[in-house]
Structure formats: C-alpha cells, structure tokens
Amino acid sequence: LILIRHLLNILVSKTKQMQTVYVIDAVRTPIGKYGGALANIRPDDLLAHVIKALIKRNDTIDVNAIEDVIAGAANQSGEDNRNVARMAALLAGLPVTVAGNTVNRLCASGLQAIMDSTRTIACGDAEIMIACGVESMSRAPFVMPKSPTAFDRQAQIFDTTMGWRFINPK
C-alpha cells in the first residue's frame, strides 16, 4: 500500500498540463440511402476516398506526422470487419507507420472516434490524428445463427442492418 501510494504521488506530481486540441478540417461524403448511389462502394474504399480528400485539402501537413486514424464503425461485419480504420488508411496511401484503430459505439461510433482522438492529443500522446466514421448499411451482410442441431436444414437468414441482438431469443 505504501509503495502504491508513493507511486501515485510521483505520478500526480509529474503530470503535465493538458494540451489544447483543435479540429483543423472536416470532410464527409454525401448522405446516402439504402441501396442508393453509394451502395456499390465498399466501406473501406469509401473511407479511403474521404481520407485522401482530407490529405489533399491539407497538403501542408506531412502525412508521416499523422500518428493514428481512429474510425467509428457500428456494423463491423462483412467487408469492413477487419479494422476498417487501418485498411482505409493504407488504401488512402498513408504510410504503414500510421496506426489504425476502429471503435464501435453503435450510432455514436464516429463521435467516439472524435472523443478518443481528442483525449489522446490532449494527454500529449499524439499531435496529429484523423478521426472518422464509416458505415454502409446497403452492404451489411446477411447472417445465419448457429444451428441448434447438427445438419439442420432449417437455416434462417437475418439482415444485420437491424442489429445483432434481434436474432438472440433471450
């Protein structure tokens, strides 16, 4: 207990002032609709397009100085199930040294990405980050729940645009 308290006193005494965080620019795609003009574009390609536009508009920022891309994505399944932030960053041409992190807070996933980026910069852990969000409900996959018995031929298919919880019978 004494060691922990002493350690806490050292940590508290060495904390630095929180950094002020600024939003430099914001870019977005048009708002789409289910099955609309954006329906044939993969979420990682869609996000990469927006990141490229952001970089082009802010060409004085060295892309090597970007430390992380945090993307909010509520429906992490199908094509965007493997860290869509990292995939989009690479597809946008960012260096492989730029990290990517995908967060999920359902409808507030993009907002969570902004909050996480803000907190990281405010704490002094990074200087330049990209916060973003992406979703394509038109491309959300259909799923089949696990069969109750082996070789069951009564498979049901569910649309994931309604969320995952609805197929749970509890």
Regions found by a protein language model. Give the residues of each.
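A glycine-/small-polar-enriched, mobile loop at the entrance of the PLP active site in fold-type I
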Residues: 71-79
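Short polar catalytic/cofactor-binding loops
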Residues: 26-31
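Acyl-thioester C-C bond-transforming condensing/cleaving domain
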Residues: 17-19, 33-63, 78-82, 89-170
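Short, Lys/Arg-enriched N-terminal segments with co-localized hydrophobic residues
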Residues: 1-17
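Short glycine-rich phosphate-binding loop at a beta-alpha junction
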Residues: 65-72, 130
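Residue-level signature of catalytic and energy-coupling elements of molecular machines
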Residues: 24, 66, 110
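A residue-level signal for beta-strand positions that form part of recognition/binding surfaces
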Residues: 20-21, 68
